[in-house]
Regions:
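A short SAM/SAH-binding and catalytic strip from SAM-dependent methyltransferases
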Residues: 108-122, 145
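A short glycine-rich, Lys/Arg-flanked "PGG" loop and its adjoining helix->strand segment in the class I
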Residues: 123-138
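N-terminal, positively charged/glycine-rich alpha-helical extensions of SAM-dependent methyltransferases
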Residues: 1-14
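Conserved class I S-adenosyl-L-methionine
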Residues: 138-149
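Conserved alpha-helix/loop element of class I SAM-dependent methyltransferases that forms part
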Residues: 22-42, 57
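Class I SAM-dependent methyltransferase SAM/SAH-binding core
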Residues: 43-100, 124
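A short acidic, Gly/Pro-enriched loop at the edge of an enzyme's catalytic core
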Residues: 98-110
């Protein structure tokens, strides 16, 4: 974990959830969850979960038969997301987008809310996303502005 990633510990996850989620992230999370639900996936991977705003929206909008795996590089963010919880079971797992700990072709959809622009090697991370997607799978992500790879 880099020093920047370590900075998101202590009170930061709670402050992030309390202030930034309602001001910035909630609306986009709902949009990504709606788009994901429209694809009727069986298995969804969320990368850069943060405090779980997208995870909660996915859990509410996807059928209980859809498996959701929520990952983040920062354990403190995952801990905050777990503490808040979801409306149904979700697998929470620390993971690095540069080296996803999943078998090839294991997810129907990969969702990344405002995380891609922070990947130190975007091409490598997106290669990992492609690797874990099933043939015909979908990647849904958003960024603040343009993205350069």
């Amino acid at each position: 974990m880099s020093s920047n990633d370590k900075a998101f510990s202590g009170s930061i996850p709670k402050v992030y959830e309390t202030f930034l989620v309602p001001l910035i992230f909630e609306e986009y999370a709902q949009d990504l969850a709606r788009r994901t639900a429209g694809l009727a996936p069986r298995r969804v991977l969320e990368i850069a979960t943060s405090t779980g705003v997208v995870t909660r929206a996915l859990a509410a909008q996807l059928p209980a038969t859809t498996e959701i795996v929520a990952t983040d590089l920062n354990p403190a963010m995952i801990e905050q997301a777990q503490a808040i919880g979801t409306s149904r079971p979700v697998t929470w797992q620390p993971a690095d987008a540069m080296q996803l700990p999943f078998p090839d072709a294991s997810f129907d959809v990969v969702v990344i809310q405002f995380g891609v622009m922070f990947f130190p090697d975007k091409a490598k991370a997106l290669g990992e996303v492609r690797r874990v997607l099933r043939p015909g799978g979908t990647v849904l992500f958003n960024v603040w502005d343009r993205i350069e790879v």
